[in-house]
Amino acid sequence: MSRLIFFILVTAIYFVGNEACKEIEIVIKNTLGPSRILQYHCRSGNTNVGVQYLNFKGTRIIKFKDDGTERSRWNCLFRQGINMKFFTEVEAYRPDLKHPLCGKRYELSARMDAIYFKMDERPPQPLNKWRS
């Protein structure tokens, strides 16, 4: 009987803990300038959003749940300019293996000088400069 109670308690804790975690959002914004197109390619483990294009002032959101493993790591390759000559690679999300980050919003904004990163209410910070 005590084993049954222990099993039910462990099962309840597992399901309640996992259900409370909200999705994490990676927001990608194109603020390069009028008539400038941003190309991005984001991937994580077996998830691959493919090559996507974003017009000026466009916004895309990638939503996912952190499973607490390295498979939750998201990397994005950005390209812009004539013939997509300028590029940079960004680690958009790195999981905290001890404490999953639930409901966070990570914003990546493409500007002419660099990709800027913003989290929560903090001001945007330059993350990676464009390379050619």
Curated annotation (Swiss-Prot):
Localization per record: Secreted
Keywords: Secreted, Self-incompatibility, Signal
Short name of one Pfam family: Self-incomp_S1
Record-linked InterPro entries: Self-incomp_S1
GO biological process: rejection of self pollen
One GO CC term on file: extracellular region
Range of residues in the leader sequence: 1-20
Lineage top rank: taxon: Eukaryota
Family in the record: Belongs to the plant self-incompatibility (S1) protein family.
Protein name, as recorded: S-protein homolog 15
Upper taxonomic lineage: Eukaryota, Viridiplantae, Streptophyta, Embryophyta, Tracheophyta
